[in-house]
């Protein structure tokens, strides 16, 4: 009789999460995006875009010092506009379950509009995600950025996952 064992991932699940946000304005969309990353503190990292799941028991902490060039799992939202005077926003929320054995949810949202609208929306998205799962929320943490375009502008918000 063959023994079966659990399948193990070759990747270790991150155990910290940091919420960051920033804005940028430049003469082209990519540099506006890059400036927003720099202002959020993650501009010199290689972001690996992930879906919106926070590993169980991960701690929410201020952004740690991560070596430049590191591959960093990140959920993020951003809004770019080339319309001078237009206001753009991006937000991210993390819903933490009461049952600490469950994963948390990361929700990202971006819009043409203001920071309050964006942050309210992204928090409601987290609530709905928990309702769909039938889980109870312990806490929702969120952050958002807002930018009024001068040339080409970008609002950015992210949840960067890392390791203790």
UniProtKB/Swiss-Prot annotation:
Binds 1 pyruvoyl group covalently per subunit. It catalyses: L-arginine + H(+) = agmatine + CO2. The modification Pyruvic acid (Ser) is found at residue 52. It is an enzyme of class 4 (lyase). The record marks 51-52 as: Cleavage (non-hydrolytic). The keyword DNA-binding does not apply. Its cofactor is pyruvate. GO terms for molecular function: arginine decarboxylase activity. It comes from the Archaea. Pfam families: PvlArgDC. GO terms for biological process: arginine catabolic process. Keywords: Decarboxylase, Lyase, Pyruvate. Its EC number is 4.1.1.19. HAMAP family: PvlArgDC. Belongs to the PdaD family. This is Pyruvoyl-dependent arginine decarboxylase.
